[in-house]
């Protein structure tokens, strides 16, 4: 913590200097007291969010970051709230923006530009594979860490699969003018993947050449240049770099190179080492927790027993929190359910394993959790369908079972959850996939009862 920069303790975090400010609040440096870890806490003013009608944007950013776990995407670790503020605990990236780096040092060498572009494409491609389109990619939203590696940030304008129209295309104009794809400006449907690729091409141009490919003080003239793809690519760039830029900055999206084409391009392939996403089970993310009072800061999860949930966490998991308006998602129960059970953890794990095995799943036992895997049709990957199972102790006779899908078909996930919850004495499937109130669950805790769906 920087001297003179200490502030009040906040739910287990010691707050420090302000890193930046935006429309809805500020971002502060924070240190986690239990681990000493460094984080960036985005503090949003709920009144400001409501007055600017930005609830959907904030909700979208949270919902998006919950899905993404990749070395080149900024990680969301925790979300909490008070009556007046929303707190997003994010990965701390201490190298600043790519924009600042280029503004200060100028254009990058082809070798360095290629390395960063490979990381950018790895991160963006990972997002696309999960149905997430950024829609506002620019150097200001690409951070650089202390080791010189990039992290994609600011997913407030991103789109998820449920935002697609009946034609399978996106229809909302988003993004920054200089980086926006021509098809997005036409107010017609557009492919989110191809529009993101265009923005990546503009970023590559800026990295290698040092200025924008499309720029003009007059916004109409700027848009005309973008529509025409009217830009000059210097001859001093290597032939293969020129070729890739032209293929990305193709104004006709039907002719534009796609993600697979970029990854197989000779310029991109040089010294390319693909980066693997994080294991989805590496670390869980906590959502919906009410901001602890100052005297509660030592009551942190995992201090004494990684299997136990304290009363504060239990309240945070319930659906009756003020946060519901920000964190509810119609698709969320298709990825994770939790229900209460009276079975001891060992017996619960045995029952889960038995139910999953009978349905043809492979079961791997790890520390305090099970991994349930099944090969789906058309895939040779044994992890093409994967669900993790955990059991948390609420008390001597009440536990919480969590089933969380990492990959795979929602219908198969629903079938698996129905079987396991039924075998453990829970209520019917429709109730399992609905969010129940905390009070009802505690009153019915003698049987397996759904507690919440995150």
Curated annotation (Swiss-Prot):
Residues 334-363 are annotated as: PPI. It is an enzyme of class 2 (transferase). ATP binds at residues 19-27, 42. SMART domains: S_TKc (SM00220). Residues 154-183 are annotated as: Activation loop. Pfam families: NAF, Pkinase. The active site is at residue 136. Transmembrane segments: none annotated. Its EC number is 2.7.11.1. GO terms for molecular function: ATP binding; protein serine kinase activity; protein serine/threonine kinase activity. Residues 13-268 form the Protein kinase domain. CIPK serine-threonine protein kinases interact with CBL proteins. Binding of a CBL protein to the regulatory NAF domain of CIPK protein lead to the activation of the kinase in a calcium-dependent manner. Belongs to the protein kinase superfamily. CAMK Ser/Thr protein kinase family. SNF1 subfamily. The activation loop within the kinase domain is the target of phosphorylation/activation by upstream protein kinases. The PPI motif mediates the interaction with the ABI (abscisic acid-insensitive) phosphatases. This is CBL-interacting protein kinase 17. It comes from Oryza sativa subsp. japonica. The gene is CIPK17.
